[in-house]
Amino acid sequence: MNKLIGFGAVLALVAACDQRPSGDDTVEPPTQEPVGEEPVVGTRQVTVGDLNSALYNPDATNPLRVRVSLDGGVQQLQVYGVYVDGRIAGLPYESYSFQDGGDSRFFRAFAAESSDGSVNAAVVSDGGQFNRFFGGAVANQENYSAPSGGLGRYRGDYVGLVNFGDPAGEGPEGAGSGVPTESYAITGDVFILADFTEGAVNGEIFNREFEAAAAGYLPTGAEGDYELPNIVLVVGDIASNGSFTGGAEITVDGQFVNVGSYGGLFGGTNATSVAGLTRFGTGFLGVAEIASPTAPGGVILVPLGNGNEIEHGIFVLDSTGPFTTD
């Protein structure tokens, strides 16, 4: 279970008919251990947020289906429909959603497949209801052969979903937390650099911004012209099966601050594509300067927000050119 604006999800994505593989806190912590905070590598699949499995087929009648288990209860497969109002202009990710009536959780999703069909990824989240949210991401690999070595470069678009947003339905009269919420999306550019000689990968997500629907949003402590910080995907190892995981950082006053993790899979002959996922927590919204309570005239840097904001995201990228060697 996940505390609203906080801690992971229990999801399982499955796709359609042909069944192709698709791949310092300011609140009290939950009573149980948080789950799904680090990417988990499986067979041709990497998940985060306790996504158990995923199949995505953009050509199927029902490209995306999602199974959400609330507190380990009965899992029910749901078809996610195309969400036209959730599309973001120029973003090469398909938009989906599911809501079983206007008084239930509103789940928003984005998914994409590489141009060669070798990898795909999906991210799903609701914005919260009844003091909890459920969300996560998955990357999957259809096929892969490793290059003999050299540097691979991958550039393109990133999309993430946060565990807060605007009301997306109605609860009973007088209800507060019972009103469902739709996740805001965050978009950006991503650059992945992979060294297949050394078996290492790293990258950066930059030009990050909230979608237009969140134009009025400012995290707690932010003022004026607010900008999301760049997030660096620090060096991680590439396994023989093309999977990888690593940490994510922002830079604060010259210091590197961990804000989460990333993972994914390379795909295609000689790693022509890559699908990745992210999970960012406390600090990913940036920091603010406040007056020091102990040093007159001094300032301290504190994370924006209330400390429980979470972002799950994905990227699906094609190689931008032939590999180079030193």
Task: Specify the residue positions occupied by each region the protein language model found.
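Sec-dependent signal peptide recognition
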Residues: 2-10
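C-terminal motif of bacterial Sec signal peptides marking the signal peptidase cleavage site
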Residues: 13-16
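Mature soluble binding/inhibitory domains
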Residues: 18-326
